[in-house]
Amino acid sequence: METTVSAKNSLENENFLKEKSETVFLDEAAITKPPASKKKRKNRKKKKNNGPSEQFVGNNDLEEQRSGSIDSKDKEKPLDEKVKELENANKTLSDLVRRIQIQRDEAEQKAEIYNRDALNTKQEHLDIKKRLEKSDETVCKLKEENENLQDMLRNVGNELVESRDEIKELIEKQKVQKESVKSHESELSSVMSSEILPKASSDSAGSFEPPVISNISKELINKEYARNVLLQFLENHEHRDKILPILSTALDLEEVHQHLILKNLN
């Protein structure tokens, strides 16, 4: 806006200078014209040269010459003043033209700076727009990743809950199995102490020593113990139902295997 206003002012100043210069040139042309008093003086000189016969007329001419010279002196003064005024006006106009030219150059420089700044601002705007678009894309990706992580966390939480429930069930089953093993061990110890162990010791000529059954576990059972239990199971038909659970523990037998053994022996 500032550059356009300054350019408009410079154009108006140029038009004003043109009009002023035209008026100055017209005034100078008017000054260069010879005044009418000089013509009158020439005519008077001609009349004077005609001779003394016209003395009365000559006297009148002298009076007219005196009055004309006075008038010409009076007129020459304002002409000189006008010349000075015109010279001063020309000087003022030249100074004004120079100032206007300087203002015009400054306005052009400001316009160039303004255009350059406008281009830079436009480029910065485009760069900011691209950055915003990239930021929006990044935000969308982060939202998707966040949703995926939340889904994964929910799935992991559900799996943990299921695993915890399964662990609880396994612990309960293990407790039940331990209790059943303890009950079977106690029954077997009573049977072995009363009937099975004495007979087995007599058959093996006193070489068999009963193991410590109270501390039996699946990991600590050895081959000798498993062999002795198997022999006792085969020899004692009456107590097979009680010996079979301990035998299945020693040999890691499933219920299917237990039923198969009982079926074949019976």
UniProtKB/Swiss-Prot annotation:
Keyword Coiled coil: yes
Compositionally biased tracts (Basic residues): 36-49
Keyword check for GTP-binding: no
Keyword terms: Coiled coil, Cytoplasm, Phosphoprotein
Annotated SMART domains: Grip (SM00755)
Gene Ontology cellular component list: cytosol; Golgi apparatus
Region (Disordered) residue spans: 1-88
Domain GRIP, residue spans: 216-264
Composition skew (Polar residues), residue ranges: 1-13
Listed Basic and acidic residues bias regions: 63-88
Subcellular location: Cytoplasm
Ranges in coiled-coil conformation: 73-188
GO biological process, one term: Golgi to plasma membrane protein transport
Entries under InterPro entries matching the protein: GRIP_dom (IPR000237)
Pfam families: GRIP (PF01465)
Covalent S-S links between cysteines: none
PTM sites of type Phosphoserine: S10, S202, S204
Name by which UniProt lists this protein: GRIP and coiled-coil domain-containing protein C365.11
Source lineage: Eukaryota, Fungi, Dikarya, Ascomycota, Taphrinomycotina
